[in-house]
Amino acid sequence: MKKKILIYAHYYAPDKASTGQILQDMAEGMQDDFDVTVICSVPSYTGKIDEKYKEKKIYEESLNGVKLYRVPVPEFSKASKKSRIKNLLAYYSQAKKVTKKVGPQDYIFTISQPPIMGGMLGVYGKKKIRTESGEHPKFIYCIQDYNPEQILATGYVKLKPVLKVAMSLDKKSCRKSDLVITVGRDLVDTLKNRFKGEEVPEHTMINNWIDEKQIYPLDPSEHGILEIKQKYGLENKYIIMYSGNIGLYYDLEGLIKVIEKFNGSKTPDGRDVVFAFVGAGSVLDKLTAYVKKHNMDSVVFIPYQDKDKLIYSLNAADVHWCVNAKGIKGVSCPSKFYGIAGVAKPVLAVLEKGSEVEMLINEIGCGKVSEPGDYKAVEDNIRWFIDNADSSELAEMGNRGHDYLVKNLTKDISIKKYTDVISKL
């Protein structure tokens, strides 16, 4: 008889949040070994909620064999702190209520989202739920990003007493867990630093992944790629793409000023250079306003792509950005790297030295990296990618990244690691 695992997931399919996609892959990939239940919010990543989910009730569903409890949350604006916090608190409160309905569980799995509350839900679940034999379930806390460190790095909340309480709560979640899993070597260092002079909680590191059966290199003549290029005016262009959350943690407001210097640029083989931003987030309006004000015809904004079209938008680029703001090293790990490697494209990275993905890019040799805030180095790297647009070196970089991914960072490899460490608890 399979053991039971409960997963707390603020976002889950069809929401396009990267953490939601990771947890969907995990939930569905673990079904050979576990009976999986997920507590998540109704689809709401964009801030809007479909009419069919607006009744204030719990929605019980099944998706690809995974049992879901979707809890009601209010709509929100990504630009409004108050409405975002209200949304997060609603999910936290409703998820606690549903916890009492899920029945016996052998394992509780949660990630570090929503900030602080993700870990607290795991602690709550371990306390309230029992196994079939009446014992407390094992609690696995997967830290995708550290808070309050991330909040502090971005200045999203500046009240020190609030941050002190938040740190205390998240350290408690780590202590109460039976296993902490981080997604980068630098995040392991942060865990050790958090507990300097204390007993460090049991922990391991497992990289995130990409589903190599859904995201893989395509021939540029593929219909889906041509369709996207035609739709957004990208035909015969040299495309430097940012794909993902256009939010607080990436210094995009600084990078757009560097990009402005390349307005109207061409490659040696005569193609116009275009900077494409694919996605949405709290900084999008500021970027679009800046681009409009400065007449930056070389910048194009494209909405989030459905999961079945993501392969085409990622393949449409010649080069991909992978960026984090200063202070994010050891705090968060940009999952977009795995998608870039998945489609065998070179990486234009802005990452701190010693961060997991910076180390991977340099170890593999699949891109150019500069430090956050070093805009001259960013400018030099952009220029290098433009000057070498017709060079075979770009394809070689992309292929090195893809080869490494296929051998080390596929969905099946990483999920087997999760299954193995959880089963041993």
What is each PLM-predicted segment?
Residues G270-D272, V278-G279, L284-K309:
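Nucleotide-activated donor-binding/catalytic signature segment of Leloir-type glycosyltransferases, i.e.
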Residues Y250, V299, D306-Y312, H320-A341, ...:
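Nucleotide-sugar-dependent
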Residues V42, D186, I206-W209:
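Carbohydrate-associated surface elements
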Residues M1-E61, F262:
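N-terminal subdomain of nucleotide-sugar transferases
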Residues K54-K57, Y216-G233:
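A short helix/loop element that forms part of the nucleotide-sugar donor recognition site in Leloir-type
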Residues M117, Y124-K128, P161-T182:
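Membrane-proximal helix-turn-helix segments that form the acceptor-binding/catalytic region
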Residues S392-N408:
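A short, well-ordered alpha-helix in the C-terminal region of glycosyltransferases
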Residues L234-Y250, I256-I259:
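Conserved donor-binding/catalytic core segment of Leloir-type glycosyltransferases
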